[in-house]
Amino acid sequence: GALLPDGRRLTGKIDRLAIRENEILVLDYKTDWDPPVELPPDHPYVAQMASYVMALGLAYENRPVRAALLWTSAPRLTWIADDMIRQAISHMAAIT
């Protein structure tokens, strides 16, 4: 797990991580039978990916981190918008 600036430990399992020269890509596989067309900002999957982005951002400070969900039943790739990630991180920080 990653140690957050406030001392809490973040644990989780990233399904796929691509460490590229100019960015970090984090991908999580989802097996929902009926994947949503859109994810609202307060969806638990957005919070999950925001947690990964936050931890990877601490580890790879000089590279942007992008997050996506791969729906295995569709198959479809959904990128999580940066503003949604920032909103979820702000929300997590506010509830601590």
Where do the protein language model's features map onto the residues?
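Structural signature of nuclease core domains in nucleic-acid processing machines
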Residues: 1-96
